[in-house]
Amino acid sequence: MKYQQLENLECGWKWKYLIKKWKDGEAVTRYIDTSEADAAIAELRKLEHEPTQVLAWIENHMSEALDNKLKQAIRAKRKRHFNAEQVHTKKKSIDLDYRVWEKLSNRANELGCTLSDAIEYLLSEASRSEKASMKVSSLKEDLSKLLSS
């Protein structure tokens, strides 16, 4: 699926990606000499508020080994950005214990549906069961009152 490319936004993402990699100790420049690398990093750090100039920095100074990784990271970030705009494509995550996940997974397989669909089904069943239980309790109370009078 193709997503619209937003130059300013993506340049900011690229700058953040490169700075994070640099802070993590990875070589983000193509230079072997540390003084050249330090000068290039200093130039990159100055570009924080000028995101579109990051493209020129990438072309002139970035390590070739990082090129593909940067493209993949930006593509993934773009996908998450656009999917987050729509309620139905926005993803949420939850932490489950393994045994809970296993039970849910087995139930989803029995129902022939996804984990999300299984959760939705189980919640609606629990709600229906709760309403029925409340109705039975109410009927018992009414019957008790009727018999005691």
From Swiss-Prot:
Keywords: Cell cycle, Cell division, Cytoplasm, DNA-binding. It holds the Pfam family MatP. GO terms for biological process: cell division; regulation of DNA-templated transcription. Its main location: cytoplasm. It is found in: Cytoplasm. Disulfide bonds: none annotated. GO terms for molecular function: sequence-specific DNA binding. The keyword Cell division applies. GO terms for cellular component: cytoplasm. The keyword Ribonucleoprotein does not apply. Transmembrane segments: none annotated. Belongs to the MatP family. HAMAP family: MatP. Homodimer. Required for spatial organization of the terminus region of the chromosome (Ter macrodomain) during the cell cycle. Prevents early segregation of duplicated Ter macrodomains during cell division. Binds specifically to matS, which is a 13 bp signature motif repeated within the Ter macrodomain. This is Macrodomain Ter protein. It comes from Vibrio campbellii (strain ATCC BAA-1116). The lineage of its organism: Bacteria, Pseudomonadati, Pseudomonadota, Gammaproteobacteria, Vibrionales. The gene is matP.
